[in-house]
């Protein structure tokens, strides 16, 4: 609140210590009283004294007629691109992040030059703190599709609490409910773990690649939603959360030492889970589960599109890193192959494919065919990313190889 000017009839008692401090600083006698008469408060005088303002500066300031410090308006003249008038390219979509990528603000450099949290297009200060970013290479994280995918993601909202008809579930045979609960336990855990790992890497990506960071934030939210929805299904129909999912593959994800290694390791899970969700009606025991798989598939489709386009762009910019990616794929495939052989992973799917415990042998045969479908689609997605892969990791190949191979 601004200080009120002292009136002519108001006497302000100036403490002796204030006058003593003024003399130490070279204030001539009467300068404090002159400042008070000019309308400055005793508190403002004290602030000047404590700040060490000398007498000459104080006298000059009073003689200038200024009531207070003048604002520094140099921020109004920084040489950023002025006169931008972004407009929606599609009125139905509104003003998108793509629409504001105009002029220099839409230029995403191949290498981001700043280590601070400067926004793209801002004018940098002479010196700023290093904020700890480690990813400055656009090719590592970028795909042009992140811009439209972000817009799709923020519009494709669904809430497990209200968009799934939980009250519609009916009791299932115990063996079937146990299989559903175990599958949902695994899917919830995998969603949670992937969201945690992506969240761990998000702060490493420089602010200059804002659109990629925005899209990845929607992926993390999608995975949190999947964690919630699958866990709810395990606990809503008389079942329970089942046995912990195997962690060999999750460990490989956690051990990734770079963002390209992380995404290469996640590629097989992103692809095979998308195939699972798209074929959810083969495992679903209710309309709610069909709806749940369909909604989860929509989210996973966006993530896999980013995976394919990012890897394609990365290999175009860094062809020398192609062989390295195969190392990561082999490691991930072997971990997945080991987990697919785990009874806690294969058993529930086989039972659900068969329709019951007594027919599980036929379900195991059907599951082997489904695994082949998952792997074939995984290979197709890699081919779309310009890195075809005919030779698979041995443990994965053992699951899907033909009987006569």
Can you name each region flagged by the protein language model?
Residues 136-158, 220-243, 308-315:
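Conserved alpha-helical segments that form or flank metal/cofactor-binding pockets of metalloenzymes
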Residues 187-195, 216-234, 263-274, 293-311:
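Alpha-helical transition-metal enzyme core signature, strongest for iron centers
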Residues 213-217, 291-294, 323, 327:
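Short, charged, amphipathic alpha-helical segments
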Residues 220, 249-270, 274-286, 291-294:
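Eukaryote-skewed repeat-based solenoidal scaffolds used as protein-protein interaction platforms
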Residues 194-254:
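Long, hydrophobic, well-ordered secondary-structure blocks that form the structural core
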Residues 2-11, 28, 36-39, 46-50, ...:
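Terminal targeting/low-complexity segments that flank the catalytic cores of oxidoreductases
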Residues 251-257, 269, 279, 308-333:
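Extended amphipathic alpha-helical segments with heptad-repeat/coiled-coil character used for oligomerization
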Residues 202-206, 281-284, 314:
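Secondary-structure edge/capping motif, primarily at the C-terminal ends of alpha-helices
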């Amino acid at each position: 609140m601004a200080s009120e000017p002292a009136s002519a009839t108001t006497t302000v008692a100036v403490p002796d210590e204030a006058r003593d401090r003024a003399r130490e600083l070279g204030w001539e006698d009467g300068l404090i009283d002159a400042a008070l008469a000019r309308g400055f408060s005793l508190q403002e005088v004290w602030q000047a004294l404590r700040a060490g303002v000398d007498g000459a500066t104080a006298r000059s300031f009073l003689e200038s007629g200024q009531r207070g410090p003048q604002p520094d308006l140099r921020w109004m003249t920084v040489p950023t691109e002025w006169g931008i008038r972004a407009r929606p390219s599609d009125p139905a979509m509104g003003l998108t992040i793509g629409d504001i990528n105009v002029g220099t603000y839409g230029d995403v450099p191949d290498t981001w030059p700043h280590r601070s949290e400067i926004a793209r297009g801002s004018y940098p200060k002479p010196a700023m703190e290093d904020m700890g970013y480690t990813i400055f290479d656009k090719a590592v994280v970028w795909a042009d599709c992140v811009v439209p995918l972000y817009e799709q993601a923020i519009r494709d909202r669904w809430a497990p609490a209200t968009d799934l008809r939980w009250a519609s579930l009916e009791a299932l045979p115990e063996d079937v409910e146990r299989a559903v609960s175990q599958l949902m336990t695994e899917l919830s855990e995998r969603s949670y773990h992937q969201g945690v790992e992506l969240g761990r890497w998000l702060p490493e990506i420089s602010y200059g690649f804002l659109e990629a960071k925005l899209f990845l934030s929607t992926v993390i939210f999608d995975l949190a939603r999947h964690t919630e929805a699958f866990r709810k299904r395990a606990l809503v129909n008389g079942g329970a959360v089942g046995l912990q999912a195997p962690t060999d593959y999750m460990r490989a994800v956690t051990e990734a030492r770079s963002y390209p290694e992380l995404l290469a390791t996640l590629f097989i899970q992103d692809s095979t889970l998308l195939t699972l969700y798209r074929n959810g009606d083969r495992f679903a025991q209710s309309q709610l589960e069909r709806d749940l798989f369909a909604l989860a598939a929509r989210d996973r489709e966006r993530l896999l599109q980013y995976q394919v386009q990012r890897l394609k762009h990365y290999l175009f910019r860094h062809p020398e890193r192609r062989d390295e990616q195969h190392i990561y794929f082999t490691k991930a495939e072997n971990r997945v192959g080991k987990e697919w052989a785990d009874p806690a992973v294969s058993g529930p799917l086989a039972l659900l494919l068969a329709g019951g415990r007594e027919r599980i042998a036929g379900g195991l045969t059907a599951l082997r065919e489904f695994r082949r479908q998952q792997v074939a689609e995984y290979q197709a997605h890699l081919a779309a990313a310009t890195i075809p892969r005919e030779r698979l990791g041995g443990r994965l190949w053992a699951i899907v190889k033909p009987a006569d191979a």
